[in-house]
Amino acid sequence: MQQIAFNEISAAEVSAIPAMQQLKLFFSFKVDEGCLTGNPIDPRFGIVERDGRRIYRFRSDEDEYRIYFTVEKNADGDNVVVVQRVLHADSLKDFFFRSGMGHDGEDKKLAKSRSFWKLIDDGEKAARK
C-alpha cells in the first residue's frame, strides 16, 4: 500500500469533488512500480517530463479527472505519492483551448507547456495537509 499525501491546493481540489466520486476515484488510483519506472502496465498512467523534471498522470476510469503526482521518499526510504493537482477533464480541455493546444497527445503537449508547469509548481510550493 502506498502512502498518499496532498498539498493545500490538491486537497481543496479533491474536496470539491462529491464524496462518492472521491471514493471511486481513489479506489482506482493504485500506483505500482511500473508506474514509477516509466513502464506503466495500466494505460491510465502516464509521465510528463520537462527539463529533467518528472510528474506522473493518472486518468480516472470515466476519463473525468486527472491526478498529477510526484513520488518522494519518506524518512524510512519508502515511496510517498504526493498529489500535486487534481483536475476535472473539462478544466483540462479549457486549459488546452486557452493555451492554443489541441487535445491529442495530451502528455506530450503538457510537457512543453510553461503554464502547466506553473500549475504544478504552485502545487509543489503549497503546504502539505
Regions found by a protein language model. Give the residues of each.
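A short, surface-exposed loop/turn module that caps and links secondary-structure elements
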Residues: 31-59
